[in-house]
């Protein structure tokens, strides 16, 4: 959600800024801009729409400079207009900002009384004027930034330049990700590693309260008390190839097809250990796991559906009660506290604000034990968690999550079995059986991917519909939820999901010949119940699209379409059945001509409320 990039070098940084912003497009945005210091003066270009349009304007205007900053904006305060796009300028001070300033109205009134004139509706312009005000009082750029942020309430990542100090720029972080890229005689800042990987693999992650001065010959970092500090240097393992499309039409399609490999990578430690030791979740995990009496899962969106799936595994395999809650709801209610419950947070980015704040709230309430499941090392959520387990999905560029979801499921399954083994609920024979199911999973997922041509044919039918209903039972109900979410996210077709047994309690009223009904029907203990629910749909003239196992014994007929996956894959069946619903959403969006990787109104990393 929004993106920042800045650079200072002995070369023209405009191509670096443009390429960095293109790498940040996946986060979601509606406008973009860059500002450079050229011959001591600020030059700025902003556009609504795609980064490519802004880049053309910058080229036509002959932008070239050794110092500059850029931004992709996802509108929060103020509409999608060029005036509201970043960078924002105040009397020779120019900045870009991610986050939300909660007290911007108070500051706006104060600054207006001092004679400042506002050109936009944004909260960001307040910060530019505040910094200029403090420079007028005698502070240098860094000091003015440090004074300004003390007056702000909210979250922010900032990069700031001034015509008065053309040999450096400064930045600040509070609640929003920001990193510094360390190059050879050049330095960069960005909200995401993908924006700097073109120039360097060496990065420093700023912490909340940090400010920094960035020069060609070095950097200086200061903590919230304005004392100089050292932050650790990290070598990123992100590759440029992982950020490129290769042979695929969209990143979402690429990421769907990467799942056999990333699932194998994520389960590698368990396979190498020939079991499910607590060590998979950190050195302290065994002592923590032995003392817990329940699990509380907090997550948002797709990660929440991963948590719902995990509840079935944790309760059935480990014999522990498991509660799953949407993070944005949990943090605003007086929640029940049991210090012996393990709080598990799930976030692809590790920066999801509602999940981060829910974790802080849980800790403040008295929850002592926390585990984060995340795809981004050194992000905010893992930094404040007691235990950490990283998925190994690699960069996920498509806004609609695919491989991050299935790798989360693998980690959650490993958690359920590890707890079960430790508690004596899983014996050696069953542990070996679970491990074998895990080994076979990448092959099962690949077989599901081989169904793509059949699923693409279904998409031709779905593309002309306005609504869809997804049904599942037990372990596969959360997969129905995920299928409905994917379809609505990228094809803009209204889709809902229900437990199949709930049809007669309301949703059946919606069923007619124009409502396609997707059913996830593996050959498990609930199959006959699902078949009965399907008959309820057929009796009302509904058209059924069924994802079934090879041995589920469905026969196609008018109004009943069936695609068969491989034979039933036990408790890991939800992962295999995830692939078809991802492909159905993708190909339906393709037929409808929507922007698959950047669906309207959505952002990849939701770092605001």
Swiss-Prot record:
It comes from the Bacteria. One of its GO terms (biological process) is carbohydrate metabolic process. Its EC number is 2.6.1.16. It catalyses: D-fructose 6-phosphate + L-glutamine = D-glucosamine 6-phosphate + L-glutamate. It is found in: Cytoplasm. The keyword Transferase applies. Residues 2-217 form the Glutamine amidotransferase type-2 domain. InterPro entries: GATase_2_dom, GFAT, GFAT_N, GlmS/AgaS_SIS, GlmS/FrlB_SIS, Ntn_hydrolases_N, SIS_dom, SIS_dom_sf. The keyword Transferase applies. It is an enzyme of class 2 (transferase). Keywords: Aminotransferase, Cytoplasm, Glutamine amidotransferase, Repeat, Transferase. The active site is at 2 (nucleophile), 604 (for fru-6p isomerization activity). GO terms for cellular component: cytosol. Residues 285-425, 458-599 form the SIS domain. GO terms for molecular function: carbohydrate derivative binding; glutamine-fructose-6-phosphate transaminase (isomerizing) activity. Catalyzes the first step in hexosamine metabolism, converting fructose-6P into glucosamine-6P using glutamine as a nitrogen source. Homodimer. This is Glutamine--fructose-6-phosphate aminotransferase [isomerizing]. The gene is glmS.
